[in-house]
Amino acid sequence: MGCNPPYHLSYRLRLLLLFTLCLTVVGWATSNYFVGAIQVIPKAKDFMASFHKVIHLGNEETLGHDGATKKPELANCPSVSPNLRGQSKLVFKPDLTLEEIEAENPKVSRGRYHPEECKALQRVAILIPHRNREKHLIYLLEHLHPFLQRQQLDYGIYIIHQTGSKKFNRAKLLNVGYLEALKEENWDCFVFHDVDLVPENDFNLYTCGDQPKHLVVGRNSTGYRLRYSKYFGGVTALSREQFLKVNGFSNNYWGWGGEDDDLRLRVELHKMKISRPKPDVGKYTMIFHTRDKGNEVNMGRMKLLQQMSRVWKTDGLSSCSYRLLSVEHNPLYANITVDFWTAA
């Protein structure tokens, strides 16, 4: 009997000590956990701050100052497009319509096109003088649009239409085209293009260089030979500065002939040299036609050529007068209609 109380006291003491020890261990583990958590929280905050900074910088690269999405800047197109095919066999469908051509060129709008895959090296305006040649125009547009697109050009096509039945003035129409096209875009290069000539080889680049370019080396109607050694007609390319330097074309060539030789003389007067592509590249098909009424041969062209050196400063872009009747933007081209009411 005397031994029982000490036994029970010792057992309870053991339980108390065991319970105290357990509390101590749990407390120690818990305190270590919270200390570690406190140390981790600042690191987590630093990580999230860095993450948000990266996201913000990424957004700055794709958003403009006004919050609008910015497209990444395109690389320049190559000087020679990888899309070129070379010589093509041209086919002219007798029942071809403008609507068919529009369907084949869905990325052309208001006569304008630019490549989406790269930044074009030049902005090129194609100027086509026109009157009563609707079928020729359709055929040219059918082939010219894909031709220029394969060259990866930023281009616009302008048809300059002379109204009325008075004598046709190709050169003055081209001066008008130059002046009016520059109201819409600061074009780098101008291609002066007859409506009845269709290029056959897309390596014949419709771009401008250090010197004026004559692109028609040969055509089917001449056996693909140059018409004469100093021929500078049909299709020519001059930069904005080159054409301005020579004061453009003369305005005084009414009817057919002489204006292209006059331009050549102006180019030579300014010590510029005419360049041409290789004969197998500068090939064109001329669509057959008879002489238009109102475009008879200019019998006074030789006299005008003789006085070019005296009058070029006052006869050209600087004196090109006309009445602008309309500027209409069709899907495939811009149509500029003018009246030369002072025509003789």
Swiss-Prot record:
GO biological process: one example: carbohydrate metabolic process
CDD domains referenced in this protein's UniProt entry, alphabetically: b4GalT
A UniProt-annotated Pfam family: Glyco_transf_7N
Pathway given in the UniProt record: Protein modification; protein glycosylation; Glycolipid biosynthesis
Keywords noted in UniProt: Disulfide bond, Glycoprotein, Glycosyltransferase, Golgi apparatus, Lipid metabolism, Manganese, Membrane, Metal-binding, Secreted, Signal-anchor, Transferase, Transmembrane, Transmembrane helix
SUPFAM superfamilies assigned: Nucleotide-diphospho-sugar transferases
Purpose: Galactose (Gal) transferase involved in the synthesis of terminal N-acetyllactosamine (LacNac) unit present on glycan chains of glycoproteins and glycosphingolipids. Catalyzes the transfer of Gal residue via a beta1->4 linkage from UDP-Gal to the non-reducing terminal N-acetyl glucosamine 6-O-sulfate (6-O-sulfoGlcNAc) in the linearly growing chain of both N- and O-linked keratan sulfate proteoglycans.
Protein name: Beta-1,4-galactosyltransferase 4
Organism: Mus musculus (Mouse)
Gene designation: B4galt4
